[in-house]
Design a protein with these regions (language model features):
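Non-catalytic DNA-recognition/assembly elements of restriction-modification systems
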Residues: 1-30, 37-52, 136-148, 155-205, ...
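Sequence-specific dsDNA recognition surfaces
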Residues: 2-3, 17-69, 86, 91-92, ...
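Periplasmic-binding protein-like
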Residues: 310-316
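A short beta-sheet element
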Residues: 48-114, 119, 223, 248-308, ...
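Hydrophobic residues in beta-strands and at strand termini
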Residues: 10, 100, 135-137, 224, ...
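Short coil/turn segments at secondary-structure boundaries
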Residues: 33-39, 124-126, 187-190, 207-213, ...
Length: 384
C-alpha cells in the first residue's frame, strides 16, 4: 500500500491504514432529534455538530444512541470532533458517530482525528475529506501511553480556559448586581441613547483595489473579519498607504475604543465586539465596523458591558431571528443607563482589574494550547 507523503511520518513499527479500514461510520440506525425539538434541560443530552459539547437536551429514551460508550462524534459541516462518555441522542443533520474497526484506543483515535487538517469547504459536508486520510495504529500499549500524555496536557489547557470563562461570568454578574438587567431595568435607571453617551462612528469605505503590503508607510485597517469576541485578530490584515489618509482623521482608532463588527456580528463564541487595548501601528476603521468612544473611561466600561449583553442582542433582534447586520440607527438608539459617577467608578475599577486577570489567563491558555499542539505533533510522529 502506498501512503501519501503527509501520512508517512509515522514510525516504521506502526501500522498505517486507510481511514475506511480503520474507522466506520456508525450513524445509521440511530434516531435523531430535530433542532426545534431540543429542550433547555432534560434527562439526556443531545450531541449535534455544533461547537459546544451538547446542543440541548431531550427526554426521548427510545432515541438514545446505540453505539458503545465512549464514542466519537464528527460534525460533517463544522469539522468538530467530540468525545462522548455518557448516553446521548444524536442531533439531526451533520452529526456522525465514528467507531474504530482496527485495534484503536478511542482516546488515541480522538486525539489523532482532532489534529488532522481538514480544509473548510464552507457549509458543505466534510466526511468525504476525512475518508481520504490515513490512520496510524501503534501497539495498543503505546496508544494508551500517548493518549494519557495528551489527556493531561489538554486538561491543563481546559482548566485555563475555564478560568477565563469564570472571570468573564464574574464580571457579568457584577454588572447585573450593580445595575440590574438592562432588559427589564428593575432598578429604574433613567436611560439615554448611546449616541448621547458616546461618539459613535462607522468606518470609511476604503477601496480594496488600493490596499498595499505592510510597510513603514502603511496603516492597518480594522475590518469586520478582524473583530472577534473580546479581541482583535490580525491574521488576515489589510493595509492602506499613509499618503492617502488626508481627511480621514475621524476613522483613526485610539486605545480603549470599543469596536463592533456590524455584519454577521454574532458567532458561536459571542458578539464580535472588543476593546482596543494595544495599538502597535495606526489602525483605521473600515465601513461596517463601528467605533464607540465615551466621554470618560468609567462610562466606556459601562457601555462595553451593556453592549456585550443579552439586552443588546434583543434590541437588535427583537424577534430572536438571526440578522445579517446591525444598522447604525439601531446602534445609536441603544439605551444606556445613567448611573451615579460613584457607581461608574466602582464598576470601572472592578472591570479593569478583572480584564487584566483575563489577559493573563489568556496568555497562559495560549501557552497551554501551544504545548498541547507541540506534544500532539511529536506524538503522531513517534517522538513522544
Amino acid at each position: 500500500m502506498t501512503v501519501p507523503e503527509e501520512f508517512s511520518r509515522f514510525p516504521d513499527h506502526w501500522d498505517v491504514l486507510p481511514f475506511s479500514k480503520a474507522v466506520k461510520d456508525a450513524t445509521s440506525g440511530n434516531t435523531k432529534v430535530q433542532k426545534g425539538d431540543y429542550l433547555e434541560s432534560g434527562s439526556i443530552p443531545v450531541v449535534d455538530q455544533g461547537q459546544s459539547l451538547y446542543g440541548g437536551y431531550t427526554n426521548e429514551q427510545s432515541a438514545i444512541c446505540k453505539s458503545e460508550l465512549p464514542t466519537i462524534v464528527f460534525g460533517d459541516h463544522t469539522r468538530a470532533f467530540k468525545f462522548i462518555e455518557e448516553r446521548f441522542v444524536l442531533g439531526a443533520d451533520g452529526a456522525k458517530v465514528l467507531e474504530p474497526l482496527a485495534k484503536l484506543d478511542k482516546r488515541f483515535l480522538f486525539h489523532y482525528l482532532k489534529q488532522l487538517r481538514i480544509e473548510s469547504a464552507g457549509y458543505s459536508r466534510h466526511f468525504k475529506f476525512l475518508k481520504e486520510t490515513y490512520v496510524p495504529v501503534p501497539p495498543l500499549s503505546e496508544q494508551k501511553r500517548i493518549a494519557a500524555i495528551l489527556d493531561k496536557a489538554d486538561a491543563l489547557r481546559r482548566k485555563r480556559q475555564q478560568a477565563i470563562d469564570l472571570a468573564d461570568k464574574f464580571l457579568r454578574s457584577v454588572f447585573l448586581d450593580m445595575f440590574g438587567d438592562p432588559v427589564t431595568n428593575p432598578k429604574g435607571w433613567p436611560t439615554k441613547p448611546l449616541s448621547q453617551m458616546a461618539s459613535v462612528v462607522t468606518g470609511y469605505p476604503f477601496k480594496s483595489a488600493d490596499y498595499v503590503d505592510e510597510s513603514a508607510e502603511s496603516v492597518r485597517l480594522c475590518r469586520g473579519a478582524n473583530v472577534l469576541p473580546g479581541t482583535l485578530d490580525w491574521k488576515d490584515a489589510r493595509f492602506w498607504p499613509q499618503e492617502h489618509l488626508v481627511g480621514l482623521e475621524e476613522y483613526l482608532i485610539e486605545q480603549d475604543d470599543i469596536v463592533l463588527a456590524m455584519d454577521r456580528p454574532w458567532i458561536s463564541s459571542g458578539l464580535k465586539v472588543c476593546s482596543v487595548d494595544v495599538i502597535e501601528v495606526p489602525i483605521y476603521l473600515v465601513q461596517r465596523v463601528a467605533r464607540i468612544r465615551a466621554r470618560n473611561q468609567a462610562m466606556q466600561d459601562l457601555i462595553y458591558a451593556s453592549i456585550d449583553s443579552v439586552a443588546f442582542a434583543r434590541h437588535c433582534c427583537p424577534t430572536e431571528t438571526t440578522i445579517p447586520h446591525i444598522s447604525p440607527v439601531e446602534l445609536k438608539a441603544y439605551p444606556i443607563f445613567e448611573v451615579p459617577s460613584s457607581l461608574l467608578e466602582c464598576f470601572s475599577q472592578v472591570s479593569r482589574t478583572t480584564k487584566r486577570k483575563i489577559k493573563l489567563f489568556e496568555h497562559a491558555e495560549r501557552e497551554s494550547a501551544e504545548l498541547f499542539a507541540s506534544l500532539s505533533q511529536k506524538a503522531f510522529s513517534g517522538q513522544l
